[in-house]
Amino acid sequence: MTNIRKTHPLLKIVNSSFVDLPAPSSLSSWWNFGSLLGVCLAVQILTGLFLAMHYTSDTATAFNSVAHICRDVNYGWVLRYLHANGASMFFICLYLHVGRGLYYGSYLFTETWNIGIILLFAVMATAFMGYVLPWGQMSFWGATVITNLLSAIPYIGTDLVQWIWGGFSVDKATLTRFFAFHFLLPFIVTALVMVHLLFLHETGSNNPTGIPSDPDMIPFHPYYTIKDILGFLIMLTALSTLVLFSPDLLGDPDNYMPANPLSTPPHIKPEWYFLFAYAILRSIPNKLGGVLALVLSILILAVVPLLHTSKQRSMMFRPLSQCLFWLLVAVLLTLTWIGGQPVEHPYVIIGQVASVLYFLILLIFMPLISILENYLLKW
């Protein structure tokens, strides 16, 4: 008799995605981050659901409701810090996942890659709106500064900002709608993840060599299920260590002060995972130019497949491209550092040089060095 997992209409979809899925035999730990992102999303949705049961999205009570969750709700502090630091783990896994895609040429699966970029934007929007909800100083001023950027859009900008705010400043209406969207977006993200996987399973996984692996496939279960579970354990250990030992390590102390529209914090900055984009935004002394650079810093990923000039897919056997890739990583780390610094010499010029380098590496140096490598290999 055929196994029920192969015949049942629902189970056979799960079976072909997670059990009998043919996978390349050479996948390294860099392929663990997709499943880790799935776990992060599940943790965020679950903790977020329980937080939403106690949170109130009203300017008068939002800050106090978060304090109430931490002090009075059973294990509320665990929920709150799991959710806050879970977002950090989410972005660590996201950036490593995208980096893996860039290094090993996974972007040549263009549909999967483009859905991934949409997912990245959706997760960033979700995280931004979530940061506003505790209604601390940095929540309020972060929301004010970032939404205000839309006023740089010609003609409709000002109207658009007031429409998003629901008034003439960030206030009760803004907080309520941000809560509504923050609740809704993760479910849209979940749907997009399914589309992402659908497109991935049309082509099958890439592998570290970038060479087609059709002749040498192994079943996903038990090989990669066990490997993924090890990844889960390592990530959840790291997350619980962060939550239980230094839950505020990645947060901003200003957010423990209730939002006050009459007093601006000395340094307005977003959460650490947006600092690289914030540094690029600040490096251009023009509002519209800065906003365009900010959007393009992520959207540039969409042109990477078009600029692939190498005859090889992966960077595994391309040392010159590897050097450029790690230079790009160094530039991004520099931008992250600069985003958290005040706008003064020498940070301004360092940020501007790093921003220019970021775009140059992706748009010009990578394609050129690939052409050189083809020539050196007589291809």
Swiss-Prot record:
TM annotation in the entry? 33-53, 77-98, 113-133, 178-198, 226-246, 288-308, 320-340, 347-367
Binding-site residues, a ubiquinone: H201
Cellular component terms per the entry's GO annotation: mitochondrial inner membrane; respiratory chain complex III
Extract the PROSITE patterns matched here: CYTB_CTER (PS51003), CYTB_NTER (PS51002)
Q: Which SUPFAM superfamilies match?
A: a domain/subunit of cytochrome bc1 complex (Ubiquinol-cytochrome c reductase), Transmembrane di-heme cytochromes
User: Which residues does heme b b566 bind?
Assistant: H97, H196
Where heme b b562 binds, per the record, is at H83, H182
- One Pfam family of this protein, by short name? Cytochrome_B
Q: Which UniProt keyword terms apply here?
A: Electron transport, Heme, Iron, Membrane, Metal-binding, Mitochondrion, Mitochondrion inner membrane, Respiratory chain, Transmembrane, Transmembrane helix, Transport, Ubiquinone
Q: What is its main location?
A: mitochondrion
Q: Where can this protein be found? A: Mitochondrion inner membrane
List the GO molecular function terms: metal ion binding; ubiquinol-cytochrome-c reductase activity
Q: How is the cofactor bound?
A: Binds 2 heme b groups non-covalently.
Cofactor names: heme b
Q: Which family does it belong to?
A: Belongs to the cytochrome b family.
Report quaternary structure and partners: The cytochrome bc1 complex contains 11 subunits: 3 respiratory subunits (MT-CYB, CYC1 and UQCRFS1), 2 core proteins (UQCRC1 and UQCRC2) and 6 low-molecular weight proteins (UQCRH/QCR6, UQCRB/QCR7, UQCRQ/QCR8, UQCR10/QCR9, UQCR11/QCR10 and a cleavage product of UQCRFS1). This cytochrome bc1 complex then forms a dimer.
One further remark on this entry is: Heme 1 (or BL or b562) is low-potential and absorbs at about 562 nm, and heme 2 (or BH or b566) is high-potential and absorbs at about 566 nm.
Q: What does this protein do?
A: Component of the ubiquinol-cytochrome c reductase complex (complex III or cytochrome b-c1 complex) that is part of the mitochondrial respiratory chain. The b-c1 complex mediates electron transfer from ubiquinol to cytochrome c. Contributes to the generation of a proton gradient across the mitochondrial membrane that is then used for ATP synthesis.
Report what the protein is called.
Cytochrome b
Biological source species: Erophylla sezekorni
